[in-house]
Structures are given as structure tokens and as C-alpha cells.
């Protein structure tokens, strides 16, 4: 995708192993470095869902018109609600692509998990992501301290109410 172009259409597909390996190599800068992943081999050893052929079926890849991977989502049925995770190619951050992908994921969740609310967790300092989620109808409902692979962090729990 060329710099400054507007994406008119995104294609969604079940995330492939090749796309997952591409995601592992994405490198974020500044405060967002926290989202950089370990190597593929380390993630496989740790049981990361992205690297597991079966668990990866809950992930979707989003491609632009040039078939370049611009982001991914994970929609995981947790009984009463659906857990939502999202990642963007670092080159796409801050360009509105997250809003488009989030909207597409909400629509997919409505189709696949009829009537279930959608929940996500986001670091409390990540205003860019929080604003994206709010723009698509998510609301902050709680704050938690959560253990991650790099230690504890403060997270908002946000919910999209499907009523």
C-alpha cells in the first residue's frame, strides 16, 4: 500500500500461519513497543494462540486491495460474551484503519455469536486505541490490574452491548 492512500476495501480471511509469522515481525515504536512480540519459536513454546493451528481459527486477517496484511482480530466465544482482540500493522496505526477493522469485527461477531456482548481489555494509557473503541460503541465498564507476559499492567475493560 502506498503512503497516504485511502483504503477503500478490506478483505477478511481466516488468519494463515504465514500471516501470523508476519505479525510476529511487526515492530512498534515509542510507548507502543510494549506490543512487540517475541520470536515465533518462543511464542510456539509458550503456547501462544497465534501460533497454534487450531486456536488460530478464531483469528481473522484483514488485507488491503493490494493483499497486504493491515491488521488482525480475534473473536473468542467465552460463553455469555465474546472476547475481542485486535492488532494493526504499525504502518497503519493512527490512520483510521482500526475503526474500520473494529466495525467489521463487530459485524462478524453479530453474525457468528448472535446477541452476545463483546468485551475487550486495553491498557489505560492507550488513548489512541480507547478512542477507536469508543468511536465504535464500546464503553469502559471497569479497570483491572492484569498479569501479562511482561508483568502487571492497568487495563480498562470495555464492552460493546449487543442489545
Model regions and ranges:
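Conserved SAM-binding loop
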Residues: 12, 94, 122
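Conserved N-terminal entry element of GNAT/NAT acetyltransferase domains
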Residues: 1-21, 162-163
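Short, solvent-exposed beta-strand edge segments and adjacent coil->beta transition regions
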Residues: 7, 83, 115-117
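A short, acidic/glycine-rich surface segment
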Residues: 45, 70-71, 141-148
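Alpha-helical elements of the RecA-like P-loop NTPase motor core of helicases
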Residues: 21, 130-131
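Acetyl-CoA-dependent GNAT
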Residues: 14-17, 24-93, 108, 112, ...
Amino acid at each position: 500500500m502506498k503512503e497516504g492512500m485511502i483504503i477503500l476495501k478490506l478483505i477478511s480471511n481466516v488468519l494463515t500461519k504465514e500471516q501470523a509469522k508476519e505479525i510476529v515481525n511487526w515492530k512498534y515504536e515509542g510507548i507502543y513497543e510494549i506490543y512487540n512480540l517475541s520470536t515465533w519459536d518462543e511464542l510456539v513454546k509458550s503456547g501462544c494462540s497465534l501460533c497454534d493451528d487450531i486456536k488460530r481459527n478464531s483469528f481473522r486477517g484483514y488485507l488491503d486491495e493490494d493483499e497486504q496484511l493491515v491488521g488482525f482480530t480475534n473473536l473468542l466465544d467465552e460463553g455469555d460474551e465474546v472476547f475481542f482482540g485486535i492488532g494493526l500493522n504499525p504502518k497503519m496505526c493512527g490512520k483510521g484503519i482500526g475503526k474500520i477493522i473494529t466495525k467489521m469485527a463487530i459485524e462478524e461477531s453479530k453474525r457468528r455469536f448472535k446477541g452476545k456482548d463483546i468485551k475487550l481489555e486495553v491498557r489505560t494509557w492507550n488513548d489512541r486505541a480507547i478512542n477507536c473503541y469508543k468511536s465504535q460503541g464500546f464503553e469502559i465498564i471497569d479497570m483491572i490490574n492484569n498479569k501479562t507476559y511482561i508483568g502487571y499492567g492497568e487495563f480498562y475493560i470495555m464492552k460493546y452491548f449487543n442489545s
